[in-house]
């Protein structure tokens, strides 16, 4: 999987990726499974997490509402991969993804959001290795 653009928001994640030989839905499902298990484990094992009990109860409540999750649920059901078929569409999606924190009022400029590839595209420090578009 190649990651070109990403932005982690408080309630969701956006990515522009390329996968070859696999359906994007399968890759996203595996990604969600892996990260869900590890995030929940990190919360449960962190003695300094002040919201631990509340978070764990929310994971468990979400799992009860799902037919296919048993031990806690982190991500919403489903995913929404779309094919980016032209340079104009790609540019529009990159702009939309990077501007998400600005539109949400979390930062004044996209490259200030720590959890985004916007800083990489502005020449700043690298948080996650990406493949540039």
Residue ranges and their predicted role:
Residues 1-133:
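Short catalytic/metal-binding and nucleic-acid-binding patches
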